[in-house]
Amino acid sequence: MSDIEIAQANEATAMWPITKVAAGLGLSEDDLELYGKAKAKLSFSALNALKDKPFGKLVLVTSINPTPAGEGKSTITVGLGDALQQRGKHPVIALREPSLGPVMGMKGGATGGGYAQVVPMEDINLHFTGDMHALTTAVDTLAALIDNHLQQGNTLNIDPRRILWKRALDINDRALRHVTIGLGGPTSGVPREDGFDITVASELMAVLCLAENIADLKARIGRIVIGYTYDRQPVTVADLKVTGAIAMLLRDALKPNLVQTLEHTPAFIHGGPFANIAHGCNSVLATRTALQLGDIAITEAGFGADLGGEKFMDIKTPVLGKTPDAVVIVATVRALKYNGGVALKDLQTENVEALAQGFGNLKRHIHSMQSYGVPVVVAINRFTSDTDAEIQFLIDACAKLNVKAVTATVWADGGRGGLAVADAVLAALDQPAHFTRLYDPQSDVKTKIKTIVQKIYGGADVDYEGKANSALRTIVKNGWQDLPVCMAKTQYSLTDNAKTLGAPEGFTIHVRDIIPKLGAGFLVVMTGSVLTMPGLPKVPAALNMDVTDDGKISGLF
């Protein structure tokens, strides 16, 4: 059965009403805002009632550099939650919301897979509770208000050539990366160059995911720099006097969404910034709520430990007020062989030599996560093509690093297939975690960037090209240099070149621009050729999707 067929069978016969899932967390129906029988948001009153409740343990799930198909990080996260529940624990999962861009493009669904999924699968992958639409509307409303300000006299003296704020769409559409607007004469606006980001790359997504309450949301929105004046002074949303309007559009989107796994483990799915072009973590509110309602919160960060993992540690944890007690790194035999130079078409053939060559990639990620002082477990997401010799090589190679590596078969077996991972995680949680920051936020911007390049990526140096040096001068001039940095980089490589696989050393990262995101509270460092509006592949996943006359969806994954 396909993922969607498994999910639909569960939804028809076994899925609990969300009120029953909530009751297991100690929540009443009055604490919920229901979206049908299977989805709910937590009310602000429920969130406020939890504010003084102590935290449980926190487990971060990250991964090695993936193949284009992904390595099952969300699947392992869900399966680990189900396995911990089978071990008598009270886990709560916290995941990101899928973006329609990858759903319709490369990946198909993004709610786990097989018998380790969150449900209702179709709803979550498509429109869910409307958060993405609210964000897109808020982004584009702000853009419209900026252009209206230009049209109505421009009292703030905004330079149309130096507007940073872009419009957004939650779909991959390369044709919208660079557009010209305001054509059609004097009544159609001020002509200028503009562009679209995918919604999950917009600063408002990061703001939503880092905001702790409505007051913090408004403060962060007000700080967003939308552009510069003719004399190069920053202009913020607060200067436009539209902070309240934008926050109003995001009021309900700020509330975490509660759903369940196939095995009824509670899961908060909320916020979805990409990890290659944003900070890649679900909302602080969702993770914090999971920590307060369960004894173990399991969350994931996007792509590999070099992207989402690093950003979770350096950007999210200071806001969350909690550091991980253990880290799970998801690895697959196929991805390590891919990093060892095997072509995609040959990944199902046994090749221990290539696996050994690609193991350097996993080793780099293990060392980078260990540098934070947190116990590490490796979860090998086993595929049917993996051989016993390949699996044993990985287990032995990790053992030489004093790291426990175990296999998981949660796609096929659900929580039962994740019991070995659960046991390894529980053992790791018994070890002390001595969290250490990677860098001092007060250090200069170049030092922070170089620290990440050397300690996380294994690189040697950083080259500043194009607009990067003038951007640095602007950052220092305005006193923004104390913010953490958010690296925008390809997910397929430790370098900024997607074709450079494995664990290279001595390379240079090329920085082409640095964009201040004062609302989010970080500086986005644009490297290589990474894009904030992806394109669709030659054969989009959308080509296999359909809906029957009675409304049943097929081909979502």
Curated annotation (Swiss-Prot):
Molecular functions (GO terms): ATP binding; formate-tetrahydrofolate ligase activity
EC number: 6.3.4.3
InterPro entries: Formate_THF_ligase, Formate_THF_ligase_CS, P-loop_NTPase
Pathway listed: One-carbon metabolism; tetrahydrofolate interconversion
Nucleotide-binding listed as a keyword: yes
Catalytic activity from the UniProt record: (6S)-5,6,7,8-tetrahydrofolate + formate + ATP = (6R)-10-formyltetrahydrofolate + ADP + phosphate
Binding site residues for ATP: 67-74
GO biological process: tetrahydrofolate interconversion
Membrane-spanning residues: none
Keywords of this entry: ATP-binding, Ligase, Nucleotide-binding, One-carbon metabolism
NCBIfam families according to UniProt: PRK13505.1 (NF010030)
Family from the record: Belongs to the formate--tetrahydrofolate ligase family.
Name of the molecule in the record: Formate--tetrahydrofolate ligase
UniProt organism field: Lacticaseibacillus casei (strain BL23) (Lactobacillus casei)
Lineage: Bacteria, Bacillati, Bacillota, Bacilli, Lactobacillales
Gene assigned in the entry: fhs
